[in-house]
Amino acid sequence: MTLKEILSASQLDWEVEKVPLFSQRPELHFDPHSTWFESGYYGIRRTDNMQILGVCTKQYQETQNEQIVERAMQIAEAVNGDYTFHKALALNGGKKIFVQLKIENSGGEYDKYIFVVDSNDGSIGLSYGISNTVLSCANQLFLFASKGKSVKHTKSIDIKADEIALDLQAQLIDIDNKIIDLKHTSASDFMIRKIVKTVMKLPVTIDERLYHDGDIVSKKTKNRVDKLLDCIAKETTEKGDTLWGLLNGVTYYTNHEIKNMDRDPSGIEKLLFSNANKMNQIAWNCVTKKGGIFDAMENKYNDGI
């Protein structure tokens, strides 16, 4: 597909413009016939429907959808020339733009993707990372590689695709190696309950073995915990009682049980920016840093401390 075809097929064939915003003195209580003053701020407006997506300063450089998709393709080309366009979406009315490109010949149990996300509301700069989709359950996991390195919107913007590609290539290798390790590491009952307690942000004073006590957690929290445990049981049954199965239990919950169909029908925004993303990131950090963290705590758990 050409760039123009991608924009059209993805309903991203619209542009944004920066327009000055005006204000009045507060005591006028919005009098349309009174004098208006330039506020010093600008609105970022879609040119097709006139919707204001965000507010910015004069220094902010708006980025067009065409540029975002083109930069994503440049990054993917620098990482691995053997890629295909997968999808592009406008999130939350176009406030953010998401582009995903599939790395061909991924093989194995999951497909691998490069993703790029940028904003039209000024909330983030161009950010990037690696995602994977487990074929058996369609669980998606998005891991950013750009934290602290996102590309800001300035007139001299330079995405430095080669440098970004090095970050992503290193992340691809690291993720693959960690997943291999997860598949060969058993998940104990303690690890499961520790993950549940951590991702659900239950009080640290709660004993993992007593989470179900109605006097300790609310009914709503108990129902959420029970649903997460059901998802973990499903995935560990299918994928084995391993940390890989445990991780997929969490991602199954965030992918298939947490929903906001009105704002996020694709389910992508929640996996990138909302609590679902935080839960996945917490679970990933826990299982990939198992070592002494789990071992020391499990000894206390087994000793009844």
Name each model-derived stretch.
Residues 1-30, 89, 104-305:
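Intrinsically disordered, low-complexity regions enriched in serine/threonine
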